[in-house]
Amino acid sequence: MNPLLQLSCPLLLASQSPRRRALLDRIDVPFEARVSPADETLAPSVAPAEAVRTLARRKARPVAADRPSALVLAADTVVAHDGEILNKPEDSSHARAMLRRLQDTSHAVYTGVSLVHAGSDRTATAVETTAVVLGPLSDAEIRAYVASGSPLDKAGGYGIQDHTAPFFVERIEGDYYNVVGLPLRRLYRTLRASFADLLEASSA
């Protein structure tokens, strides 16, 4: 168990993302995963930072209402290029188009993190932003990567943690884990700022 993150109440992850689950496993924090019934529809005009902030809160609240004694964590990640949000590709053709757009340029990855403890009527939400630069990609490289199937369930059409990523990710400015889907340092700082009483280590 992580000595810096020992909670006095259950932690519920309101997410279906295997990457977020893997990150919490990696830092050795016990949690239960729940699927949030939240509607993730937003107006197309919503700015990226506000979109992830809104959706993270929206995902956390119904799960927290069912378990008021637990601390609920929800997150939402989007990729944005020139201010336009790029969600998960609809199909292989869409994924190839996304990668052609993102290759040899910079884009931003936004993740909203929301923590809700319904028992004490507290909510804390934060947004982390990371800049990512992809190198040039040939059409053959794009087709091969998309054919692997990996891009199809990822915002922006690529996964920073994929074994092929070192070949095309040129530079990252900011939190790597944010690009994976859960900014761990931001999560910890938000916990300490708003839920210090639930962190057993903080009172030791």
From Swiss-Prot:
Location(s), subcellular: Cytoplasm
GO cellular component entries: cytoplasm
NCBIfam families from the UniProt entry: maf
Cofactor(s) needed: a divalent metal cation
Gene Ontology terms describing biological process: nucleotide metabolic process
InterPro entries hit by this protein: ITPase-like_fam, Maf-like
Active site: D76 (proton acceptor)
Record's protein name: dTTP/UTP pyrophosphatase
One GO MF term attached to the UniProt entry: dTTP diphosphatase activity
The reaction(s) this protein catalyses: dTTP + H2O = dTMP + diphosphate + H(+); UTP + H2O = UMP + diphosphate + H(+)
Pfam family, one: Maf
Family: Belongs to the Maf family. YhdE subfamily.
Site description Important for substrate specificity, residues in chain: R19, T77, Q161
Main location as per UniProt: cytoplasm
Gene3D superfamilies, A to Z: 3.90.950.10
Entry EC no(s): 3.6.1.9
Keywords, alphabetical: Cytoplasm, Hydrolase, Nucleotide metabolism
Function, in words: Nucleoside triphosphate pyrophosphatase that hydrolyzes dTTP and UTP. May have a dual role in cell division arrest and in preventing the incorporation of modified nucleotides into cellular nucleic acids.
HAMAP family per UniProt: Maf (MF_00528)
Alphabetized SUPFAM superfamilies for the sequence: ITPase-like
